[in-house]
C-alpha cells in the first residue's frame, strides 16, 4: 500500500521531500523502492513529453489526490537499469525547493518508474515556444536567481549537473523554478574531476570539450548560455551543426548576445562573468548571487508569465483533450505527444540513435562520450572520434562514430526480430532491389530517347533556318542574273537546279521533323 501523508500524521513514515508545503511520506524500503503493486495507486492523466530516455506522464496519487510526474524507462536488458540507478542516487541526495523532488521508484516487469515533482508549466524552453516570444529581462533575472540557488545546493552536495539548459529548468504554478533531469549528473569526490564529455553540445563548457580538468563551474558556463537563450530565443551557434559547434566553442572567444545594446549593462556583465573561458576566473554560483543583475530580481517578476503559461496550458488541454486515457498504461505505444522544439534542438532530438561502446547510456536527451574519445583538428575544424573523421558539412546533427551514426540521445535497443520477420525482410529487400534496377533501366532508356530527340530537334531547327536562307540566296542570284542573258539550255539548268535543291532540303527537313 502506497500513501502520502501530511507532516506529523505518522512519524514512522519516511520523509522524502517538501514540494508545495506538503511532506510526502511513503511506505518504501531503505532504497526508497515502493512496495509491490504501487503502480495501481496512480491514475495516469496525460503524457507530458517524450525523449530518448522514455516518456514522462502526469499522474494522480489516488488516496491523496496529489499530482506527480512519472518518468518511465523501458527495460530490455540488465544494463539498462544502470543509468537509471545513477540518476536515482543523485535524486535521493536532493531535498531543496529549487531542485525537483524524488518520491521513490517502482520496478515493473519491463519498465522502471521514477516518481518526481510535477511542474505543471513544463520547462522554460516549452514556455518560450508556447508564448511565441522570448522573456523580459526582469523575468530572466528571477529565473537565473532561483537556478543559481539550485546550483549552490547541488554543488554543496558535490553534485555537478553537467546539462543545464532551458529544457531542464522547470516552472510550477506557484512560480517556483526547479532544476531537473540528472541523467548525466556526476558525483565528485574532489575539487577537480577530469572525465568524459557529457551534456548537450551548445551548452557545453570549453574545458569539457578540450578535455581538461574541470569543476562545478561548468554548470555556471551552461547557465550563461541559458541566459542568452532566454533573451535571444536560442543558444549561440544554434545554426551550426552540433559537432562543428563543439569544435568552435573550445577555440573561439566567449559568445554574447545577438545585440548586446538591447540589454542592460548589468545583464551583459552577468553573462560575461558566467562565460569567462578561464575556469579559475569564472565566477561561482555563490558569487553570482551577489551580482547586481541577480540582486535586482523581484520576487513577483514571474507572476505575469506564470498566469499566461497557466492559461495557455489550460487552453491547450481543452483543445486536444487528455493525451492518455486514465485506463491506459503509461507505456501504451499508441500515445503520442510531440512537444514543440526549436529548430536547432530538432537536430539533436528528432532522430533515432544507434548504440555505441563510446557513447554512454543516459536518462536524458544528452550524450556522454568516454574519456579521450573526442579530439579536434585545428587545421580542418573536423571532429575526430577514435580516428574516425566527422565532416563539418554534416547537417543531420548526427555523429559518425566507427561507421555508426550516433544521435545526441540514448535509447535501449528493441528486442531482435523473429526469424519469420527476418526472412520477410530479406524477400522485401530483394523485391525492392529488383524494382530499383527496373526503374534505373527505364530511366536510362528514357534519358537516351530524350537525348536523341533533343539532337534531332536541334538539327531540324538548323536545317529549317538554312533552307530559308538557301531559298532567299537562290532567289537573290536569280534576280541578279537575268534569264534573258542566258541561252535556253542554261536557263533550264538554273531553274531545275534551284527547284531540285529546294525539294531535297524540304524532304530532308520533313524527315527529321
UniProtKB/Swiss-Prot annotation:
Subcellular compartments: Membrane
Disordered as annotated region, ranges: 313-358
GO biological process: intracellular signal transduction; protein phosphorylation; regulation of MAPK cascade
Any one Gene Ontology molecular-function term assigned to this protein's record: protein serine kinase activity
Listed EC numbers: 2.7.11.1
InterPro entries given in the database record: Kinase-like_dom_sf, Prot_kinase_dom, Protein_kinase_ATP_BS, Ser/Thr_kinase_AS, STE20/SPS1-PAK
Record protein name field: Serine/threonine-protein kinase pakH
Gene: pakH-1
Amino acid at each position: 500500500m502506497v500513501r502520502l501523508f501530511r507532516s506529523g500524521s505518522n512519524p514512522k513514515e519516511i520523509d522524502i521531500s517538501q514540494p508545495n508545503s506538503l511532506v510526502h511520506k511513503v511506505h518504501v524500503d531503505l532504497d526508497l523502492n515502493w512496495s509491490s503493486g504501487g503502480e495501481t495507486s496512480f491514475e495516469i492523466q496525460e503524457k507530458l513529453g517524450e525523449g530518448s530516455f522514455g516518456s514522462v506522464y502526469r499522474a494522480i496519487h489516488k488516496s491523496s489526490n496529489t499530482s506527480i510526474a512519472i518518468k518511465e524507462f523501458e527495460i530490455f536488458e540488465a544494463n539498462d537499469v544502470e543509468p537509471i540507478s545513477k540518476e536515482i542516487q543523485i535524486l535521493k541526495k536532493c531535498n531543496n525547493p529549487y531542485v525537483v523532488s524524488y518520491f521513490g521508484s517502482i520496478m515493473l516487469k519491463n519498465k522502471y518508474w521514477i516518481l518526481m515533482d510535477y511542474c505543471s508549466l513544463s520547462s522554460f524552453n516549452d514556455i518560450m515556444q508556447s508564448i511565441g516570444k522570448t522573456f523580459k529581462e526582469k523575468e530572466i533575472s528571477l529565473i537565473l536567481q532561483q537556478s543559481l540557488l539550485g546550483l549552490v545546493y547541488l554543488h554543496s552536495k558535490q553534485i555537478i549537473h553537467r546539462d543545464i539548459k532551458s529544457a531542464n529548468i522547470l516552472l510550477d504554478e506557484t512560480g517556483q523554478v526547479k532544476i531537473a533531469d540528472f541523467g548525466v549528473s556526476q558525483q565528485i569526490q574532489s575539487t577537480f574531476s577530469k572525465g568524459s564529455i557529457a551534456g548537450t553540445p551548445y551548452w557545453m563548457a570549453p574545458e569539457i570539450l578540450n578535455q581538461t580538468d574541470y569543476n562545478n563551474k561548468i554548470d555556471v558556463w551552461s547557465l550563461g548560455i541559458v541566459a542568452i537563450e532566454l533573451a535571444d530565443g536560442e543558444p549561440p551557434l544554434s545554426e551550426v551543426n552540433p559537432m562543428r559547434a563543439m569544435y568552435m566553442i573550445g577555440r573561439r572567444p566567449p559568445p554574447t548576445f545577438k545585440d548586446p545594446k538591447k540589454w542592460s549593462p548589468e545583464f551583459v556583465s552577468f553573462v560575461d562573468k558566467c562565460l569567462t573561458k578561464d575556469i579559475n576566473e569564472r565566477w561561482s554560483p555563490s558569487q553570482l548571487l551577489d551580482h547586481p543583475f541577480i540582486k535586482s530580481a523581484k520576487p513577483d517578476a514571474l507572476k505575469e508569465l506564470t498566469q499566461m503559461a497557466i492559461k495557455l496550458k489550460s487552453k491547450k488541454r481543452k483543445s486536444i483533450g487528455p493525451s492518455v486515457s486514465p485506463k491506459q498504461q503509461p507505456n501504451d505505444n499508441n500515445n503520442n505527444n510531440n512537444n514543440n522544439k526549436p529548430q536547432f534542438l530538432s537536430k539533436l532530438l528528432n532522430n533515432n540513435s544507434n548504440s555505441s561502446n563510446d557513447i554512454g547510456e543516459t536518462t536524458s536527451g544528452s550524450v556522454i562520450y568516454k574519456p579521450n574519445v573526442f579530439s579536434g583538428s585545428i587545421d580542418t575544424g573536423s571532429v575526430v572520434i577514435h580516428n574516425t573523421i566527422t565532416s563539418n558539412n554534416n547537417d543531420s546533427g548526427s555523429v559518425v562514430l566507427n561507421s555508426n551514426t550516433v544521435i545526441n540521445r540514448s535509447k535501449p535497443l528493441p528486442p531482435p526480430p523473429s526469424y519469420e520477420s527476418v526472412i520477410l525482410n530479406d524477400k522485401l529487400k530483394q523485391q525492392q532491389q529488383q524494382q530499383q534496377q527496373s526503374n534505373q533501366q527505364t530511366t536510362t532508356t528514357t534519358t537516351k530517347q530524350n537525348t536523341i530527340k533533343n539532337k534531332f530537334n536541334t538539327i531540324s531547327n538548323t536545317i529549317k533556318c538554312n533552307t530559308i536562307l538557301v531559298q532567299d540566296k537562290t532567289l537573290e542570284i536569280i534576280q541578279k542574273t537575268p534569264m534573258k542573258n542566258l541561252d535556253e539550255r542554261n536557263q533550264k539548268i538554273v531553274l531545275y537546279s534551284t527547284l531540285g535543291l529546294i525539294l531535297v532540303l524540304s524532304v530532308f527537313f520533313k524527315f527529321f521533323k
